[in-house]
Amino acid sequence: MCQAVERLYSLGHRNIAFVNSNIEYNFAHLRLQGYLKGLKKLGLKQNDNMVLNGVMTTKEGENATRKLLHESFPPTAILYATDVAALGAYKVASDLGLQIGKELSIISYDGVPEGAFANPPLTTFKIDTKKAGEQLAALLIKRVNGEAVELLRETDPAILYPGEADGSPTVSSKELSCLLEKAKIVKT
């Protein structure tokens, strides 16, 4: 996630939110730490309102996106710990008339196939699942053979698969707030 924060920063984003999975999972803890490390490295202020934990489904991703966009200074970019949660942002953007990759940038993690078919295609990080499977199989074989097996704590760097869901912001947080206010008035 540190690399994702750096990417968004290089595109011009300064208000970057993070939608995390259940913090009890090791991967979620590591992704949160990466997000926070990225903010710190770039001198961006950490805002607790810009971090939501416990988001596991597309519907929860949708709700989290709505909550973040209702902040007085909404994020121009949102990182998601999982692609499944990120896909919920697409419905919200459509409902509010926002163009993903322009008024709202999204980067997530997992590389699920559905992300490639989203409109625009999701920008995502993923790991080499073949290598991860080989590591797990080697551990299982050791275990079956009665060898002592340490817990697998090895992590490999994720690879960015650029889609079109992230781009330079076309509006500031303040301008985005005004757009969202207008969208709310039109909907009622």
Language model segments and positions:
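Short polybasic/polar patches that bind polyanions
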Residues: 9, 40, 94
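ATP/adenylate-binding site constellation spanning eukaryotic-like Ser/Thr protein kinases
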Residues: 13, 32, 119
